[in-house]
Amino acid sequence: MIVFKTPADNRTDYIKRLIGLPGDILQIIDGDLYLNNQKIQRNKIEIPININCGSEILKVNSFEEILPNGKKYIAVYNKEGSMQNTDKFIVPKEHYFFMGDNRDCSRDSRFLSSVGYVAFSNLVGKASLIFFSNDTKMGDFFKFWKWHKSIRLGRFFNKIQ
């Protein structure tokens, strides 16, 4: 997981998973991620989870994905997002391709007009620790008096995979 400044405004920090390096070709076909024409291995985790997606909470499937370099992580999908089939993304020189682990509710490199390919100069550093975690709708985040019901203490200070 990497912290970077979004290319759109060069100010907003995003934390996303680094998926593609310069020269890599990425594509999503029927919800499956392909890296350099190789389908990324994905193993379903049998327990569905609830996630926040804008103003609604969705029950989604989670998967362990394994990149060609052996790196494993958990990603969630609901198979109803708008990015189930994409054109090929070819990562330019000195740029990187990022995706959120919450695939169907993530603004990331797949959205070329708002995030797109991230230049090396926009990289801030590696995210290594979950400092704070709560389970609220984004609109409720600023209502701190409701946090006691939604704080996920079990995730505090966990190492990010």
Would you name each region that the model predicts?
Residues M1-Q161:
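Soluble "head" domains of membrane/secretory-pathway proteins
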